């Protein structure tokens, strides 16, 4: 038989699909628990800012019958006002994942390549692979992106370099001097995506602001999201900012109307009054980091706790085995084998009650070995 499915490209056929976790209710039934503490997806346990909550509560359900703005008009104008740029420099997508896909579709063709780290946000590599684009994966150095090695990997055919800053899952980051040096050495030979999904968690004055960096480097694109600090992961709103020319090119590959109306409303409202929310979230994360550090030190466990609302813990047993032990206690963490960190787990940093529950479950899970 010579059907159409036999002509599927090998790079699609060979790609292993992502399998998401089951809904919370199904997981609770599976593991026999009455509650589930989610510490697996770097979500903001404080939820959205009050302004976003109020906007969603005031939403008229009758508007669900009407298509949203096809290009997130109001949100793009709010972003432009916040960052002092043109609304046309912003492209809003159904989460950063859609924006990643749009960038790769617009800038790469089969036979081209991207460069990124080997242990970073996996979606860059995934989208490239199932699009027939090669991924040149550069090993981390001391758990951080290696600028010299990444620069060396940018040879003929490389169109995009993805720099996750801070890096997920290690929390490491390039300061302004390192980033500027990298961009000067690259000299515009490829587009550089600064994925700043966790930028709002960082208050170090030496952290480079991509929105400023791009003003002097036309080949820089900046990604940010409302999923993390702003607590709107369920609405799926991410965005890109670039030069007018670059954003116009990328917009041609983006599906219109992909961002739902509630997401647009909530994100626009969140921007309008976010200072208190950001400060409260940073305090919560700082307290959780200190708590986790004390617990790991007491247990003699290696841990990595950089910038962002997450930490990694090295475990003396298989991360998948530990995951099941955690789940039987109603605690959900992220196994890290898929990030090329076998026998590590990643833990979202959350309020005290959740961290206490994690610590209790951790001790119980380790005692079971």
Question: What are these regions, as identified by a protein language model?
Answer:
Residues 285-286, 295-329, 345:
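Conserved PLP-binding catalytic core of the aspartate aminotransferase-like
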Residues 106-163:
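PLP-dependent aminotransferase-like
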Residues 86-90, 111-113, 189, 196, ...:
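Short acidic capping loops at alpha-helix termini that bridge into adjacent secondary structure
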Residues 177, 325-329, 334, 338-369:
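PLP-dependent enzyme catalytic core of the Aspartate aminotransferase-like
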Residues 147-157, 169-192, 196-229, 245:
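Active-site pre-lysine segment of PLP-dependent enzymes
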